[in-house]
């Protein structure tokens, strides 16, 4: 084992010198710094500066570090526990349990967090639809089992609530394994998620990995890889179908940009690291389904200042099979989930995958909403009276469709006071077909808000009429 000394500390970046004759650690090796009080700090090698000096990124706070402290090369990358022992537990970036439920057994297998993506020959593609029970998603931007899904939205439009509802709907009905990775998000939300999963009984089938907002950038940059390594093991060694939730993939990029300048790299567009696309590719290419098992990943993507052209969300787009775009204007109208039905996309919205009827209903819904959007300028300037009878019918139906795309969530019951609704795909397609056929044109618009199936609209309309 090579030993060296700390020679420079700048925030989360630590330079370590190894004397001549010592083996200089490889890139991505984990080094242990002895802080002298029985504590050690793990750092990861990022750059070799020459003359036996390496530049590393700390995985925890560098408070109390001093020049001259002893550093030991572990001879390998960060290794985290994998397999059955991880289920029902909460880990940090180093794979250390943080839930006060005891240590992980020493004989538990451990894997390096840096691994190659599966080879082209091993990949498998699937066209099986993953039912979410959320009308707007199942109808207009359906998810594929074994696919990659992105939830895009600015601050406070409901990404985390949507991910929690998807966990509630899919993980509870899905008998496989779930891995939840919290990357640079609120610790409070992570704590709530843990307790909700424990209460609902899903926790025993779930591994949780957190590197939250208060952690140094090194931890936020690597915690997604820790969660992914656990998911990969369930897929490859046990042939399981795994659900991988990442909240929030933008923070992975953000952490990389925080340390990029300290590592001496020249920033690229908007101050991001020049290696943005490479880092994203290395992570995303590992999240895939193979012939052994599948990984279905659902990733929340923060959109800075609601700007979809920002390099971070724009780079993520290229890797996804389905995108669910959350729109602030819809939250202002009280439509939740605030999914934009025209901007959200899915490669699975194809008659050969979802069936002819589903495809026709979905495209007709989009056509109606698009026509309504085009007519809004005329309505705002000249009013409804200037529209033809056919256009008035289109507008009235579009408004009913827009409100009917909302629905109450189980995870938001405590805030709304309304029981959450799970709507099967067949029910969703039938309901929208009947709205398009004009069967409910006589019911008031407000009856379509925050309900599940179409029968609830009829009941609500009767109640409103009394």
Swiss-Prot record:
Topology in membrane: Peripheral membrane protein
Q: Relate the assembly described in the record.
A: F-type ATPases have 2 components, CF(1) - the catalytic core - and CF(0) - the membrane proton channel. CF(1) has five subunits: alpha(3), beta(3), gamma(1), delta(1), epsilon(1). CF(0) has three main subunits: a(1), b(2) and c(9-12). The alpha and beta chains form an alternating ring which encloses part of the gamma chain. CF(1) is attached to CF(0) by a central stalk formed by the gamma and epsilon chains, while a peripheral stalk is formed by the delta and b chains.
Similarity comment: Belongs to the ATPase alpha/beta chains family.
Q: Which CDD domains match?
A: ATP-synt_F1_beta_C (cd18110), ATP-synt_F1_beta_N (cd18115), F1-ATPase_beta_CD (cd01133)
> What is the protein's name according to its record?
ATP synthase subunit beta
Protein residues bound to ATP: 153-160
Q: Looking at the keywords, is ATP-binding present?
A: yes
Q: Which GO terms describe its cellular component?
A: plasma membrane; proton-transporting ATP synthase complex
What is the first-listed, main subcellular location in coarse terms? membrane
Tell me the InterPro entries matching this sequence: AAA+_ATPase (IPR003593), ATP-synt_VA_C (IPR055190), ATP_synth_F1_bsu (IPR005722), ATPase_a/bsu_AS (IPR020003), ATPase_alpha/beta_chains (IPR050053), ATPase_F1/V1/A1_a/bsu_N (IPR004100), ATPase_F1/V1/A1_a/bsu_N_sf (IPR036121), ATPase_F1/V1/A1_a/bsu_nucl-bd (IPR000194)
Q: Does the keyword field hold Transmembrane?
A: no
Q: What is the annotated localization of this protein?
A: Cell membrane
Q: Which residues form the signal peptide?
A: none
Cite a single GO MF annotation.
ATP hydrolysis activity
Q: What is its EC number?
A: 7.1.2.2
Q: What Pfam families is this protein classified in?
A: ATP-synt_ab (PF00006), ATP-synt_ab_N (PF02874), ATP-synt_VA_C (PF22919)
Task of the protein:
Produces ATP from ADP in the presence of a proton gradient across the membrane. The catalytic sites are hosted primarily by the beta subunits.
Q: Which UniProt keywords apply?
A: ATP synthesis, ATP-binding, Cell membrane, CF(1), Hydrogen ion transport, Ion transport, Membrane, Nucleotide-binding, Translocase, Transport
Instruction: Identify the domain of life.
Output: Bacteria
Q: Which reaction does it catalyse?
A: ATP + H2O + 4 H(+)(in) = ADP + phosphate + 5 H(+)(out)
